[in-house]
Each structure stands twice: as structure tokens, then as C-alpha cells.
């Protein structure tokens, strides 16, 4: 029978290591301004082009969300996105933990009805980033307790990008969630340059604006403008 390791020093060392990883991830996620989520159905130039332009503009996190391609096609495209993001942006994959494992992505983003965070963490390990979609403070608190590194809160405003998003919960809900948890809050849903100020002013660490960016003829320009608005509100300077 295999003996259990009961060495208290080793246990303390592991706990310290896990805490350091958590602190590092929290720091990285708090520094993010604009969060790109891909959408091949809305994109004018294609997913790879969108990622390249957005990262070049200063985007520091990319979530690859693809619902229409085969697993093989997703793996190939994800591998290319990873190359673009390497050393410049955090690379996450929506839902598909299997694809994330194959390409060694930085983590995943999952929904309320997907695999439990605890299970995803066992599969991915302590060093990977796991984000969870939430709709209110109660879900956000539970996400933090379960080990999520950040929450994606929405839909903040009414949106046509995701048909099952429901009615917008309003920017005031961000403040409620921000006050309830310590991990990073990413706002998503119906956000554009006209309403994004209220999103950041209410406490979001970063935001997602899908159609406002990927439907554009100039993804780089749109990304940079979002980053500049966010940094102006946060007081952290320009992307230029």
C-alpha cells in the first residue's frame, strides 16, 4: 500500500506555492483592460486576423469561442492563436477543456451548465486560469469559493451576440458583484464605446465587447480605442 505523505513542511510548502500561483494570476487578471472573445460567425476578417489585430493593439487576454467547427479544426486554429498570443496575451478556450489540454492553453472559460470548477481544476491543474460565467452576486460568491480565478458577469446590457443571454442586468449589478468578491470581474454583454464608461466606473476590472470589435473593418483601431477609454477611467495611461 502506498504511504501518504504526512510531512508538514512539504504540505506547508505546497500551500505556499498554491498561494503564490493564485496571487500571480489575480495580479495578471487585474491588469487587463480589454478582453477579446472571438466569434467566427460575426467576424468580418476571420478569427486569426481578429486575434492578431487585437493583440497588436494591446489586448492582453483572448478567449477562443468557437461553436461551428470540428474538434480537429478547433485544435488547429487554437494552436495558431496560441502562437499569436505567446508572450503577449493570456490565451483561454471557451468550454472545450479537451482542446485546451491539447494545445496547452493558459486556461478555460466555462458556463454555469458546464463542468464544475472543481472538476476542471483537477484536470487542468493549479497553474491554469479558470473563468466562470455568472449573472449575479450569489453565483459570483459561489464561483470564488469553488476556485474560479475570475468571473464573467453578464449580460450587462441587452445583446444579440448570444441568443440565450437574457435581458441586460444593468451596470449597477457590477458594483454589487465587485463588493462581494475579491477575484477579477469581467463585464460582458451589449457593451460598446458609448456605454463602457459606466461598466468600468461601477467596478469591472475589464470588459468584453464582441460585436463592437469583430464586426469592425479595423479591429486594431477599435481595440485600441476601448483600451484607451478604460485606461483613462482607471488612470493607467494610453495604449499608444
From Swiss-Prot:
Binds 1 Mg(2+) ion per subunit. GO terms for cellular component: cytoplasm. It is an enzyme of class 2 (transferase). HAMAP family: TMP_synthase. Belongs to the thiamine-phosphate synthase family. Condenses 4-methyl-5-(beta-hydroxyethyl)thiazole monophosphate (THZ-P) and 2-methyl-4-amino-5-hydroxymethyl pyrimidine pyrophosphate (HMP-PP) to form thiamine monophosphate (TMP). This is Thiamine-phosphate synthase. It comes from Methanosarcina mazei (strain ATCC BAA-159 / DSM 3647 / Goe1 / Go1 / JCM 11833 / OCM 88) (Methanosarcina frisia). The lineage of its organism: Archaea, Methanobacteriati, Methanobacteriota, Stenosarchaea group, Methanomicrobia.
